[in-house]
């Protein structure tokens, strides 16, 4: 019996040693090829090309994404707390990887069917994945994600990492970043959002296309109420605030920027010239072009053309 126990102990020691050696080999094989995370200190955010008249009337927008980068200093505490409560409650305590969070996620996934279960990835890991990796799941990719997160925590402050997350993450409907999401779903600035609206936005990134408040209001409200509960559990809000916000209806709707001056040919001329000057960066560099065309002059010209064509038809017929 003693011999068997010794054999089992020896086997366990060998297994642990083998796992550590394998991890070390993988670590030293991967580390040299990891991206330089200091690049995240100078991110060139993709933003659309906007065209305006001389007097500031909106004419057109070109680009695949909506985004308005925001400094972490300008993000309300309520917004930060909602995101942290649902995505990474230990964000300001861990070193990039939250082992307790991973264990909790594995346990809840194995024992429940609740899709609201938080993932094991920290906010830092999500930033690493969104900037440097793909969403394809594999243990190798997950290991790289963890190593990148550890590197990021050494090079960047917690606030810098949270700022990257809030500006990078996808919120559905071409909206990237929390500011663009607030503008699209509520037509508001971050500081104007109610607690319920803030919690709704914080819940979108998990299901940005199928769970946002306009595509699936019911699913969105379930997740909103869960986030409000998490904010209460983490001490960010009191019970009264939680219950009050949970009772609010879904008020989200699409807020597209309305064209104030219809001049598609002018807009296309501007786009072509910008591409000639700046290449593809024209559609992603966040350029705001103020043309020399005044809206009243454009409208007067259109009226003159229409009047002239009508008079020509009246004189010459069809």
Model-based region annotation:
Residues 58-61, 91-94, 210:
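Short, solvent-exposed loop/turn elements at domain surfaces
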Residues 71-123, 177-181, 186:
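Flexible, acidic/glycine-enriched loop-and-adjacent beta/alpha segments
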Residues 30-82:
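Terminal hydrophobic membrane-targeting helix
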Residues 1-52, 90, 110, 264, ...:
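N-terminal type II signal-anchor transmembrane helix
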Residues 24, 115-318:
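Non-catalytic, structured segments within soluble enzyme domains
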Residues 57-67, 102-109, 141:
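N-terminal periplasmic "start-of-domain" segments of outer-membrane beta-barrel proteins
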């Amino acid at each position: 019996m003693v011999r068997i126990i010794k054999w089992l102990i020896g086997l366990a020691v060998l297994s642990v040693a083998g796992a550590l050696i394998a991890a070390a080999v993988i670590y030293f094989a991967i580390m040299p090829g990891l991206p330089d995370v200091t690049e995240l200190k100078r991110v060139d955010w993709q933003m659309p090309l906007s065209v305006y008249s001389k007097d500031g009337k909106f004419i057109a927008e070109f680009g695949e994404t909506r985004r308005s980068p925001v400094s972490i200093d300008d993000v309300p505490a309520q917004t930060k707390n909602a995101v942290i409560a649902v995505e990474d409650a230990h964000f300001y305590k861990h070193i990039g990887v939250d082992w307790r969070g991973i264990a909790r996620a594995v346990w809840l996934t194995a024992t429940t069917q609740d899709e609201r279960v938080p993932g094991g990835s920290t906010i830092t890991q999500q930033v690493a994945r969104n900037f440097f990796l793909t969403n394809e799941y594999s243990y190798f990719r997950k290991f790289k994600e963890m190593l990148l997160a550890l590197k990021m925590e050494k090079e960047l402050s917690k606030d810098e990492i949270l700022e990257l997350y809030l500006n990078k993450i996808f919120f559905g409907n071409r909206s990237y970043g929390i500011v663009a999401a607030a503008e699209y779903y509520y037509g508001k600035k971050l500081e104007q959002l109610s607690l319920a609206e803030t919690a709704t936005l914080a819940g979108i990134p998990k299901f940005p296309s199928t769970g946002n408040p306009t595509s699936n209001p019911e699913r969105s409200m379930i997740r909103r109420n869960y986030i409000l509960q998490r904010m209460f559990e983490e001490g960010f809000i009191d019970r009264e605030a939680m219950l009050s916000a949970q009772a609010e209806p879904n008020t989200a709707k699409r807020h597209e920027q309305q064209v104030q001056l219809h001049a598609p040919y002018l807009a296309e001329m501007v786009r072509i010239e910008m591409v000639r000057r700046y290449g593809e960066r024209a559609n992603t560099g966040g350029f705001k072009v103020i043309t020399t065309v005044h809206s009243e002059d454009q409208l007067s010209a259109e009226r003159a053309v229409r009047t002239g064509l009508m008079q020509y038809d009246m004189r010459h017929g069809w």
